[in-house]
Amino acid sequence: MELNGLRVSRETQARLQHFAALFQKWAKTINLVAPSTLDDLWHRHIADSSQIFQICPEPIRWADLGSGGGFPGVITAIFLAELQDGWAHLVESNHKKAAFLMTALRETEARGSVHAIRIEDAPAEIGECGAISARALADLDGLIGYAAPWMLGKENCRGFFHKGRDYLREIDEARGRWEFDLVEHKSAVEQESVILEISNLRRLV
């Protein structure tokens, strides 16, 4: 099996398929993603989320902010299980969604844990990480603000943020408050979308 050109082992494929089935079951009772996208779960959410691990396939500590339905946090944790190293810390303050995430990580035997706390409280609980991820959470300025406690002054910590067609405007707005190195990774799933890789973060104001 391949996802966006990434070769996926049988074990990882089985984990992803189990997660997809679990997701569809839970989505009937709690709002995990927009209902209109459920029929395209593999393409719109699973394949899209896997792109972050393709960009950064390293056994490091991740903090996934506002994990919601598990994208990209659970997907990253599933890929880390194949490496048998690294860890994904999923931050989700909604307790129903956090319960789903805990179930998903346990049943897929993924390498991750859930923190049912506010994002602002997460840095003190989680500690240092090598990567921060988020998808459909806030504008870039807001995301950088959330990630700043991990990233400021830390050359080895990078942010990976999914963004849609307005990403250039969001970059301009964020540069009014922050200075950072930026790599734009074009999405292999959504034509007008990107994954923004942020590093060497400095605060301007």
From Swiss-Prot:
Its catalytic activity? guanosine(527) in 16S rRNA + S-adenosyl-L-methionine = N(7)-methylguanosine(527) in 16S rRNA + S-adenosyl-L-homocysteine
InterPro entries documented for this protein: rRNA_ssu_MeTfrase_G, SAM-dependent_MTases_sf
The name this protein goes by in its record: Ribosomal RNA small subunit methyltransferase G
Q: Which pairs are disulfide-linked?
A: none
Name the domain of life this protein comes from.
Bacteria
Identify the species of origin. Answer: Rhizobium etli (strain CIAT 652)
Q: Which Gene3D superfamilies match?
A: Vaccinia Virus protein VP39 (3.40.50.150)
Q: GO CC terms on record? A: cytosol
Main location group: cytoplasm
Is S-adenosyl-L-methionine there in the keyword field? yes
What keywords tag this UniProt record?
Cytoplasm, Methyltransferase, rRNA processing, S-adenosyl-L-methionine, Transferase
Q: What does this protein do?
A: Specifically methylates the N7 position of guanine in position 527 of 16S rRNA.
Q: EC number(s) on record?
A: 2.1.1.170
**Family classification:** Belongs to the methyltransferase superfamily. RNA methyltransferase RsmG family.
Q: Where does S-adenosyl-L-methionine bind?
A: 66, 71, 119-120, 135
Q: What HAMAP family does UniProt report for this protein, alphabetically?
A: 16SrRNA_methyltr_G
What is the annotated localization of this protein? Cytoplasm
